[in-house]
Structure formats: structure tokens, C-alpha cells
Curated annotation (Swiss-Prot):
Record-annotated active site: H19 (proton acceptor)
Gene behind this protein: pth
Function: Hydrolyzes ribosome-free peptidyl-tRNAs (with 1 or more amino acids incorporated), which drop off the ribosome during protein synthesis, or as a result of ribosome stalling. Catalyzes the release of premature peptidyl moieties from peptidyl-tRNA molecules trapped in stalled 50S ribosomal subunits, and thus maintains levels of free tRNAs and 50S ribosomes.
Enzyme kind, highest EC tier: hydrolase
UniProt-recorded name of the protein: Peptidyl-tRNA hydrolase
Lineage, uppermost ranks: Bacteria, Pseudomonadati, Acidobacteriota, Terriglobia, Bryobacterales
Organism name: Solibacter usitatus (strain Ellin6076)
Family stated for the protein in its record: Belongs to the PTH family.
Subunit comment: Monomer.
Length: 196
């Protein structure tokens, strides 16, 4: 079974903030495949189902971003899911808005949610889908920016971006990380795969 975990913060005030892109991608997958992500388990909302013939658990940790590992580690242990079948989806301020980068391993690169996950699992060999949120202009406070509502000017692109990310996650489960990286890693919207 795959555990597809979107990182974010619980609460309506954060629902459409850049920091909740991981939740939005999980919601999109849930909608596409008829999976209800409503069951509480290990400090997360989860839903079990199938994507392209693969058993999956969709999860949205409810611990707040910086404690995400506190939810995912017990969830994985309880359901005996291999770490190689964990995919973590989250926002990345180091990447421009609309960019997507799948990585099979690596550091948290300053992302506190991913840092928590790595600390709890004691390994950085965790597949992750990083979703670029940098607006392309200087920002005063990264912490304020990631928690503020997504700008109206970006809302039109948000639907496409979330759909693109959901397709990337789906491809990881169906075809593996390497193929997904080749197909989906991109610097910004509009670039073809060869340029990304």
C-alpha cells in the first residue's frame, strides 16, 4: 500500500494558503478516485482506496505543519507501510510558483514539515513532491507569506497546478519515481519536460 501524504495546517483560515498545497493535492486525488479522507487515525485524516489498481492511503496530518512526522511515523507503523511507499507532498518557497520537483531523497531544504518527517523516520530517503510557491518578487516574511491566502491573481492557475501535481503523484504510484520525475519535473508552467 502507498501512503500519499499531503502536508498542511488544519483549520479554515489556512485552507487556501500556499502552505496547504499538499492538502489540496490530496483532496484532488480523493475527489478523482472517490476516496473519503475523513477517518481519524494517528493524528491524521485518512482515506483508503485504490488508484489505478494500487491500494493507497491518502493522509492529511492534523498536527500542524511543523509536527507532521508525529502523525506519519505512527500511521506507517500501525498500517505496516514500507517507507519506499511513502510520498510526501508539500509547498516549497525555494521554487517559483507553479514549479514542481519530485525527488526520491534529500534534505528538508528548510521546510519544517519535511524536517519533522525526516527526523521521525531517521532517514532522508523519502519520496517527495515539492510544489513551488515563490511569487517571483521579494517577500518580507516567508512565515507570513506561506500562511496568508493565495493571491487572487494565482487562483486561476491553482486548479491547473493542483491537477498537475495530482497527476504526478498518481504517476509515482503507477510507474515509479524515475518516470514521474522525467514526465513532471518542471521549472515553471508552460515549460516542456525537456526544459525542466
Amino acid at each position: 500500500m502507498f501512503l500519499l501524504a499531503g502536508l498542511g495546517n488544519p483549520g479554515e483560515q489556512y485552507a487556501l494558503s500556499p502552505h496547504n498545497l499538499g492538502f489540496l493535492v490530496v483532496d484532488r486525488l480523493a475527489e478523482q478516485f472517490g476516496i473519503r479522507v475523513t477517518r481519524k487515525d494517528s493524528k491524521a485524516l485518512i482515506g483508503l482506496g485504490e488508484i489505478d489498481g494500487h491500494q493507497v492511503m491518502l493522509a492529511k496530518p492534523q498536527t500542524f505543519m511543523n509536527l507532521s512526522g508525529e502523525s506519519l511515523a505512527p500511521l506507517m507503523e500501525k498500517h505496516q507501510i514500507e517507507i519506499s511507499n511513502l510520498v510526501v507532498i508539500y509547498d516549497e518557497l525555494d521554487l517559483p510558483w507553479g514549479a514542481l520537483k519530485i525527488k526520491p531523497k534529500g534534505s528538508a531544504a528548510g521546510h519544517n514539515g519535511m524536517k519533522s518527517v525526516i527526523q521521525w523516520f531517521k532517514t532522508s530517503e523519502i519520496v517527495r513532491v515539492r510544489l513551488g510557491i515563490h511569487p517571483g518578487h521579494p517577500i518580507r516574511s516567508g512565515a507570513e507569506f506561506v500562511l496568508a491566502p493565495i493571491k487572487r491573481s494565482q487562483m486561476k492557475e491553482l486548479d491547473e497546478f493542483v491537477g498537475f501535481a495530482a497527476d504526478a503523484v498518481r504517476t509515482i504510484t503507477a510507474e515509479g519515481v524515475e518516470k514521474a520525475m522525467t514526465k513532471f519535473n518542471r521549472r515553471a508552467p508552460g515549460l516542456n519536460n525537456e526544459e525542466a
